[in-house]
Amino acid sequence: MKIVFWGTPSFAVPSLERLLREPDCEVLGVVTQPDKRRGRGNQLQPEAVKKVALAHNLPLWQPQRVKKDAATLADLRSLAADFFVVVAYGQILSPEILAMPRLGCINNHASLLPRYRGAAPIQWSLYNGETETGITTMLMDAGMDTGAMLLQRTLVVGLLENAEQVSQRLAELGADLVVETLRQQVVGQLQPIPQDNSQATYAPLIKKEDYGLDWHKSAIALQNQIRGFYPDCQTSLRGQPLKVSATLPLGSAYWSALPPEFQALAPQWTDERFAENHPPGSVIGLAKNLGPIIQTGAGGLLLLQVQPAGKRIQSGWDFVNGARLQIGEQLGLT
């Protein structure tokens, strides 16, 4: 099978590396996004897929707008590929591009389509508290994640897993599924299944305002927001920004889902304690060697990892000691 791979971030790397290892797959080249400026020096930095392509001496294209780049389109057409495999590329492909490969364009999408179409399916599925997510391969069409589905695999998600951790697991699952899809599709074993548009939901790009923590929300809603939009959710303390990147919801509804080392907190932090009259955002406890416990709109939230303004990421307990945090202080005050 002759393949052109399209992808950009680290999520796409396992799929590319898996294709490179397969004896019946010939990767003709890679299309990826242009280098971006980042870091303190604002230097141009290659994306993860480009690094892999260079390491394997693969032909590489980095068009600013692929559907407008005549030279890239001519090159791709001349390759006479069997498949284009697209994993988190970052640009919409035109009908002209979709028609180039002999057997179609296969997309690897990080959700159980038709749910969570769009740019951030992992993040929004965690934000919404989904306990299952997965990978779908599909035949691409001109819409955004609307193509006919080929194969799906499901992944169970733990209460404490964040978007980065789930992304890593889905990337590996997706790599296996891409190869399985290609092998079945090339011999005509797959029957594409049209998506039920009435069941579609969407996962748009995350906006700056999505990162703000509202302590009037329930502990579980905040937990899901923090792990979904990891590591960038933010509140404030003493008028200074405070990022929160790992938490633990406290309350009887969650004990069975927590690791054993945290279940020892159960006798101390009953539901009745969180029903007391504390303003949301208040520090209502200091769990030794763990971190501060914050009152929410429903239940308590233990802060396990934070990043104060101008400082490194630190444990909740280091934060308690470094900030000399006191019971009764309040987060989120402007």
Swiss-Prot record:
CC terms in the record's Gene Ontology section: cytosol
The record's SUPFAM superfamilies line, in alphabetical order, gives: FMT C-terminal domain-like, Formyltransferase
**Top EC class of this enzyme:** transferase
Q: Which GO terms describe its molecular function?
A: methionyl-tRNA formyltransferase activity
**Top-level division of the source organism's lineage:** Bacteria
Spell out the reaction equation it catalyses. Answer: L-methionyl-tRNA(fMet) + (6R)-10-formyltetrahydrofolate = N-formyl-L-methionyl-tRNA(fMet) + (6S)-5,6,7,8-tetrahydrofolate + H(+)
| Keyword set, alphabetical order | Protein biosynthesis, Transferase
The residues listed in the UniProt record as binding (6S)-5,6,7,8-tetrahydrofolate, with positions renumbered to this chain, are 111-114
Q: What is its EC number?
A: 2.1.2.9
Q: Which HAMAP family match?
A: Formyl_trans (MF_00182)
Biological function: Attaches a formyl group to the free amino group of methionyl-tRNA(fMet). The formyl group appears to play a dual role in the initiator identity of N-formylmethionyl-tRNA by promoting its recognition by IF2 and preventing the misappropriation of this tRNA by the elongation apparatus.
Protein family according to the UniProt entry: Belongs to the Fmt family.
Stated name of the protein: Methionyl-tRNA formyltransferase
